[in-house]
Amino acid sequence: MLLLWVSVVAVPALAAPDPGAGGQRRGAARVWPVAPNVVLVVSDSFDGRLTFYPGSQVVKLPFINFMKAHGTSFLNAYTNSPICCPSRAAMWSGLFTHLTESWNNFKGLDPNYTTWMDIMEKHGYRTQKFGKLDYTSGHHSISNRVEAWTRDVAFLLRQEGRPMVNLIPKKTKVRVMEKDWKNTDRAVNWLRKEASNYTQPFVLYLGLNLPHPYPSPSSGENFGSSTFHTSLYWLKKVSYDAIKIPKWSPLSEMHPVDYYSSYTKNCTGKFTEKEIKNIRAFYYAMCAETDAMLGEIILALRQLGLLQKTIVIYTSDHGELAMEHRQFYKMSMYEASAHVPLLVMGPGIKANLQVPNVVSLVDIYPTMLDIAGAPLLQNLSGYSLLPLSSEMYKFKNLHPPWILSEFHGCNVNASTYMLRTNQWKYIAYSDGTSVLPQLFDLSSDPDELTNIATQFPEVTYSLDRKLRSIINYPKVSASVHQYNKEQFIRWKQSIGQNYSNVIANLRWHQDWLQEPRKYESAIDRWLKTPTNPKKI
């Protein structure tokens, strides 16, 4: 049945529009003859480049391909922060990370924050959520928190276990990520038993953990590592011959922030080509399983006669490096980490359309309000995607020709800011002077191996000015440093004098007890220093 269903910018252009610019509308407030239903499926760690050529050649993704054929694909969609909670906070609030102050995986939105789903409910929509949300404060382990807070204390530079792979050698094992499948089943059952009987439009959210790597159970040398875990059933969906072995810069030539990240992720050592290829293959197989869960939702809508009445949106909170730039996980502004899938299909959405404009996850909020016919709030960071995805809109240039992404969490020792335009990717760090920026021309250097910031000083200067007009990033960096100190002090005081023994057993601090006095003294010195971004 599944197979049957599947068959059937140049710098001067950056001037406008700015967020909140007078006269610029963030959407067209289109009114459908019949209000459409909406289904939003959000996965975790899905590299957006897999949804178009040439990345699409490496793994079979039939339902993503179906959405491409019957809807609109955004070829340059980005996360606003390449880590789970801050990214999701941006998506659910429509605000950039520095506005939500979601600095790490523990700090998100207030539980009572008004999301786009709340507004849609007030405008007549029935609403339901299943699966991973992760946009409010209070989640994730104390290890994540302490590592993020203390990233400026150099001695805390500790390595995780190396990334691993694990194969279930069964050709019939389909449901590998049981939790995601159960939530998908819950969503399908809700569509069948509840939504299909509604006289009002509905909005359904399904959050998936895949293709995020699994935590490794080992407590030995791979303690704290992550495992790319799949079955033979899904691995057979991957074309090994199409897997690209990423090029790496020599360790001595790596940007200092990249080296820090690579070291903490235990990727500075030697890896065989087979190891790298397996990590990437297993990751792609996990993407195939993700696609199948998206397919369950699409099939259910079709079987219930709801597909032609429903706008389906698929995206992810961020990507996965999968050994590009000597790293796995995310926490980086490189394409594998920051580029996300974004596909939309349904009534009023143009079929088989590829949109090259740069967009980001803050655009989800105004898009949802636009679909519901709700007033579009003027303080949002994002813009509705509907003018770009529907031929019913006369004006196509409402969205600015840039997007902003920022990162302030663990595995990186400097606040990071990315301004992405049609041609350029500009990455600034910390206070803007203590860490060298990066500039990539993605049209000629898609692998982002050559930093040309010093070769094109005028472009670098212009992009930095534009970035500073959007966000006072030196001030934001200082605010994050102050926040980190305050949070660590509060945690330390809650633990009491025993804090040294507690920190010794956290995920990234196993060797603390070798020289506890030295480490405690370093913590004290860090807490007493002025709140300025660290010089690297």
Stretches with model-predicted labels:
Residues 36-37, 58-62, 111-118, 178-188, ...:
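A structural signal for well-ordered alpha-helical segments within the folded catalytic domains
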